[in-house]
């Protein structure tokens, strides 16, 4: 795992990706920090940090897109999968390398509350709780991107799929209002989600028939539930949407509340998607 970690970190900084990711994240944090905290003399660093969370949707997929997709494109995944290194070590090595790159601008941002304290009173608990939450959100986004990268050999597809998944998580509260209203738009969005799931199943199974069958069965069930028991479907699905609200627990950290439930949620997301990444690699190893 150590060798893979070193190789991945080196590869990020021998190419432009590592520098671009670090520079982009730190630049946006610095921009909001300067505009909100330094110019207007506001001690609320947590809110400035929260304003930059949207940047993750664009930057972090660029970090995770090459983790496994590049290996498949260059056919070096065969060497990796047949090496004596276990699948968990491969996944963790690549994931921790991405975390190291992402963590660099976060560590640099830790100095910002100290600078603010030179000009007045600053709540360090709120500032560093927000930074910790920011790191956990980013680590979760990277885990999602790593799994998607393991499913494809095209970096562009990996980037777009990761961006789409994170965008859905970011806008999940807006999407949820469509379902609570029970209108036609809710049905359309549900069909789109079903189509995406069916495509993923078809890709994993490498069988268009299976993916099509899943979509047809799901569509029939969807129509029946909306016609006969719409309340059941909407209640169950709203609960599922709550679980997909990846950025919601971050709000508690921004408010200065170091919640154990938020930490457990993010660690669970990371563990789940790293496990799914390992399963995708295991499947390719046996195939």
Tell what function each PLM region has.
Residues 11, 69, 80-82, 141, ...:
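Helix-capping/transition residues at the boundaries of transmembrane alpha-helices
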């Amino acid at each position: 795992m150590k060798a893979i970690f070193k190789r991945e970190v080196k590869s990020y900084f021998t190419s432009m990706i590592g520098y671009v990711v670090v520079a982009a994240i730190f630049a946006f944090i610095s921009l909001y920090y300067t505009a909100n905290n330094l110019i207007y003399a506001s001690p609320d660093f947590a809110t400035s940090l929260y304003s930059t969370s949207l940047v993750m949707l664009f930057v972090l997929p660029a970090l995770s897109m090459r983790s496994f997709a590049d290996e498949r494109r260059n056919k070096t995944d065969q060497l990796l999968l047949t090496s004596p290194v276990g699948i968990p070590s491969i996944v963790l090595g690549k994931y921790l390398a991405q975390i190291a790159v992402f963590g660099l601008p976060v560590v640099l941002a830790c100095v910002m509350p100290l600078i603010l304290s030179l000009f007045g009173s600053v709540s360090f608990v709120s500032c560093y709780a927000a930074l910790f939450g920011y790191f956990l959100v980013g680590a979760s986004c990277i885990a999602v991107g790593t799994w998607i990268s393991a499913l494809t050999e095209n970096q562009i597809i990996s980037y777009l799929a990761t961006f789409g998944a994170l965008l859905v998580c970011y806008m999940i509260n807006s999407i949820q209002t469509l379902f609570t209203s029970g209108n036609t738009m809710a049905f359309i969005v549900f069909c789109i989600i079903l189509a995406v799931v069916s495509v993923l199943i078809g890709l994993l199974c490498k069988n268009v028939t299976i993916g099509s069958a899943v979509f047809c069965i799901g569509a029939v069930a969807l129509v029946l539930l909306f016609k006969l028991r719409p309340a059941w479907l909407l209640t169950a699905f709203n609960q599922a949407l709550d679980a997909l609200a990846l950025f919601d627990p971050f709000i508690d950290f921004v408010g200065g509340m170091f919640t154990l439930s938020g930490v457990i949620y993010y660690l669970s997301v990371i563990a789940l998607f790293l496990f799914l990444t390992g399963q995708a690699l295991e499947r390719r190893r046996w195939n």
